[in-house]
Each structure stands twice: as C-alpha cells, then as structure tokens.
C-alpha cells in the first residue's frame, strides 16, 4: 500500500519526509518498568517494517515522528499492551494519510513530527483514549521530571524487543549541557524546538522502537521522541518540543483535512 502524502509543502527551504535512521544500535525503552496493561490509553503502536509509537490526539489522528518508516503496509494499533499477539481490546487501523511537518529536516531532525490520519475513528474504551495537546507552548525547564513509554529492549546491549509496553522516567537536561563537547557537541544542534532528557546515568532512556512516543512532563504532553543513543549518557534522548508553531500546524492540518 502506498500511503498518500499531501503535495502542498512550501518549496526548497522545507524538506519532505525521507526515511531517517535513529542513530542507535538497538530498539526500545532502555531500563524502565512494564506498565499496568491499558493504563497508557493514548499510546499507539505503529507496526510496519519497523516499530514506531505515537499518541492518539483525536479519534482518527495520531501524532508521531516524521522519520518513522512507513514502507510496506503499516497498521496503527490502539489499546495494545503486547506486541506479539492480538488482544480483545485492540483497535487496528490502516493509515489514510501521512502528513509530515513541512519543515522537517532529516539531517538535523528539526521538526521531526508527523500526523497520521486513520481509516476510521477510534472508539473510546477502557483501553483507548485521547491524549490532550498542551494548552500552552511553554518551554520545559531543566530538572523537570518526565516519562516516556514504548515497546522494546530493556537493556542497551540486548536488542530483542520486549513483549509489553514499558515506561522510563527521564529528567530534562539544560540545552547548554546537551550541546557541550561531552555530549552532542552541536552535532546536531539541540535548539529551542527540542527537549533533551535522560535517566539515571543512561540506565533509563528511549530508543529506536520508541520513535514518536509522547514525552509527558508533569502530566502534560510536551514532546515527541526523535533521536538519541539508547542509554548512552553522553547522547541523551532528544524530543521535539510542542511549540506554538508546531501546535498551530497540528490544529490547522487536522481542521483542514478531508
């Protein structure tokens, strides 16, 4: 199946989606703990050639990362806890339309956001619910406690996918630290549209299979998992901040969709 993409992007300066690589060696939540089944009702499992995750933000819209590979015939599974078998509470959807943020830059990962319009609308149940977008576009201050969920490896040296949804606690790190020579060294630049966050000496982190997962800080949806180095404390997880510009794009795209 070929997923349709809109053709109304601004020219030249805004790059179209091309498959990106999460620069890591394995997939999934590093460390963390398994969550109680169906307690993260907003989580969307995007199952194609590779796994990604996302957040259900309306009955037929999922927000994820632009670099997620949608080749093949991907499905969006809502209400999932296990990746290995179908559950009674699962709701499975094909993707009607994939709309990457028009200024996504696959080299720097700036604007690494993507909206997926589902074929059909989700039914709200005890396993499926909507994650509200933030009401304000405030920055997230250093030392803020956050959490991120996903499906994947529990150890950075073991790349076997986990069967269950797991969650890691991470703490926001000052961008000056993330950009210094001991961390990303401005390659790429961690700018004001990104959040840098890591766990206990790299023991808790997000990873490739978690791309697109929502970052929740103080019970507010603040960012989308973009890239990192899977538990490497020198390369903490980077999340796309839901800025005013990003939120306006999300709302206008959903309002203007057919």
Swiss-Prot record:
Database matches in InterPro entries: Peptidase_S1_PA (IPR009003), Peptidase_S1_PA_chymotrypsin (IPR043504), Peptidase_S1A (IPR001314), Trypsin_dom (IPR001254), TRYPSIN_HIS (IPR018114), TRYPSIN_SER (IPR033116)
GO biological process, one term: negative regulation of DNA binding
Active site annotation, chain numbering: 67 (charge relay system), 112 (charge relay system), 211 (charge relay system)
Source organism of this protein record: Bos taurus (Bovine)
EC number of this enzyme: 3.4.21.78
UniProt main location, coarse: secreted
Localization terms from the record: Secreted; Cytoplasmic granule
GO cellular component, one term: extracellular space
Catalytic activity: Hydrolysis of proteins, including fibronectin, type IV collagen and nucleolin. Preferential cleavage: -Arg-|-Xaa-, -Lys-|-Xaa- >> -Phe-|-Xaa- in small molecule substrates
Protein role: Abundant protease in the cytosolic granules of cytotoxic T-cells and NK-cells which activates caspase-independent pyroptosis when delivered into the target cell through the immunological synapse. It cleaves after Lys or Arg. Cleaves APEX1 after 'Lys-31' and destroys its oxidative repair activity. Cleaves the nucleosome assembly protein SET after 'Lys-189', which disrupts its nucleosome assembly activity and allows the SET complex to translocate into the nucleus to nick and degrade the DNA.
Keywords assigned by UniProt, alphabetized: Cytolysis, Disulfide bond, Glycoprotein, Hydrolase, Protease, Secreted, Serine protease, Signal, Zymogen
Known glycosylation sites: 169
Protein name: Granzyme A
Pfam family for this entry, one: Trypsin
Gene that produces this protein: GZMA
Classification of source organism: Eukaryota, Metazoa, Chordata, Craniata, Vertebrata
Source taxon at top rank: Eukaryota
Residue ranges the record assigns to the propeptide: 27-28
Residue ranges constituting the Peptidase S1 domain according to the UniProt record: 29-255
């Amino acid at each position: 199946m070929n997923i349709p993409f809109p053709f109304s992007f601004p020219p030249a300066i805004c790059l179209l989606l091309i498959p990106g690589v999460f620069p890591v060696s394995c997939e999934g939540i590093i460390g963390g703990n398994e969550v109680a089944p169906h307690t993260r009702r907003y989580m969307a499992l995007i199952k194609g050639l590779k796994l990604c995750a996302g957040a259900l933000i309306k009955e037929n819209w999922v927000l994820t990362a632009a670099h997620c590979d949608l080749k093949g015939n991907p499905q969006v599974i809502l209400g999932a806890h296990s990746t290995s078998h179908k559950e009674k509470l699962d709701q499975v959807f094909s993707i009607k339309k994939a709309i990457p943020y028009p200024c996504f830059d696959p080299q720097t990962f700036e604007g690494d956001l993507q909206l997926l319009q589902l074929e059909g609308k989700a039914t709200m149940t005890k396993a499926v619910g909507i994650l509200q977008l933030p009401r304000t576009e405030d920055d997230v201050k250093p030392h803020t406690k956050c959490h991120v969920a996903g499906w994947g490896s529990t150890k950075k040296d073991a790349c076997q996918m986990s069967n269950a949804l797991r969650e890691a606690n991470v703490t926001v790190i000052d961008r000056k630290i993330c950009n210094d020579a001991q961390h990303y060294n401005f390659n790429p630049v961690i700018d004001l549209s990104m959040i840098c966050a890591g766990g206990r000496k790299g023991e808790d982190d997000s990873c490739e299979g978690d791309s697109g997962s929502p970052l929740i800080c103080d019970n507010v949806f603040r960012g989308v998992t973009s890239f990192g180095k899977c538990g490497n404390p020198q390369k903490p997880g980077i999340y796309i901040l839901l800025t005013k510009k990003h939120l306006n794009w999300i709302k206008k795209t959903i309002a203007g969709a057919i």
